Amino acid sequence: MITPPVAGDTFAGAPPPPSQEEDAPPYGSVVLGGTFDRLHDGHRRLLKASADLARDRIVVGVCTGPMLAKKEYAELIEPVEKRMKAVEDYIKSVKPELVVQVEPIEDPYGPSIIDDKLDAIIVSKETLNGGFAVNRKREEKGLPLLKVEVVDLLSGGAEGEKLSSSALRKLEAEKANQQEGAASKGV
């Protein structure tokens, strides 16, 4: 089901809002969220694009608790502290002047529906409806709507599948099973 856009939504390719400087990033503060397990090129692309769009601050919600329950191979997801540090370290490596706020989130919204200083939410095509849902919640709370910026994710293989932490966890589980099988056969 496609959720209709809310007033204020924009998409990649649309002109950014005017800024004080021609080359300045279009938004003061941006927000995004994700699991960020085993930080890979897809994550780095999303985080770099987000940092490039922010002038002053980037807020990143990192999923934990109930947000992980339905993930494939959830038991192999790295601890939230490790994932949060990897996100913060990467953003600081690509844009050290940004204020980086990384926090655990236990629901799909996190700080995106309470922080009135945010200007834009960064999403992938797969999470676009989540961006619209955030704006509906912000509207209900009387907060300014966020611009919605869409970043394309990288492919993870020849079949054009997106690069994913789930696929990396699956490979880790298969490798562990093969090693256990070899050990039990005395190989």
From Swiss-Prot:
Q: Name one GO molecular function term.
A: dephospho-CoA kinase activity
**RNA-binding found in the keyword field:** no
Q: So what does this thing catalyse?
A: (R)-4'-phosphopantetheine + ATP + H(+) = 3'-dephospho-CoA + diphosphate
Q: Name one GO biological process term.
A: coenzyme A biosynthetic process
List its EC numbers.
Answer: 2.7.7.3
Q: Where is this region: Disordered?
A: 1-30
Q: What superkingdom heads the lineage? A: Eukaryota
Q: What class of enzyme is it?
A: transferase
Keywords attached to this entry: ATP-binding, Coenzyme A biosynthesis, Nucleotide-binding, Nucleotidyltransferase, Transferase
Activity regulation annotation text:
Inhibited by CoA.
A Pfam family of the record is CTP_transf_like
NCBIfam families xrefs: cyt_tran_rel (TIGR00125), PRK00777.1 (NF001985)
Kindly provide the name given to this protein in its UniProt entry.
Answer: Phosphopantetheine adenylyltransferase 1
Organism expressing this protein natively: Oryza sativa subsp. japonica (Rice)
